[in-house]
Amino acid sequence: MSNVPADLKYTDEHEWIRTEADGTLTVGITDHAQSTLGDIVFLELPEVGKSVNAGDAVGVVESVKAASDIYSPVSGEVVAVNEAATDAPEEVNGDAYGVWLFKIKLAAGASTDKLIDADAYSKLID
């Protein structure tokens, strides 16, 4: 069974989201996603400064088995990307919740209401 930390929010597309003290959202892929994909060999992340809408494909994660889009969980502006993750994408396999992919600042009027909690995500992947 996959690890699903209770302090994070999730999407149906297997991204995790952590709200930081300054209100930005840190985004990564879940343990379930990395486990399903297998050995991750490449990450393509969005550009800093890019405006995105909730549900937009903003990046790609490639493994030896498959490639999958990474989606923005909310509407906003990408304010940081984890260059270390692109340099060593295999680290996501070892620590899916420790290796973040990008950070986003919510757009005015945007919300996190569509994100699901750990219980709902656990049911989704069971």
UniProtKB/Swiss-Prot annotation:
Domain of life: Bacteria
GO BP terms: glycine decarboxylation via glycine cleavage system
Cofactor: record remark: Binds 1 lipoyl cofactor covalently.
Keyword Chaperone in record: no
Keywords, sorted A to Z: Lipoyl
Cofactor entry: (R)-lipoate
Chain positions with N6-lipoyllysine modification: K65
Gene3D superfamilies, alphabetized: 2.40.50.100
Domain Lipoyl-binding: 24-105
Pfam families documented for this protein: GCV_H (PF01597)
UniProt similarity note: Belongs to the GcvH family.
Name of this protein: Glycine cleavage system H protein
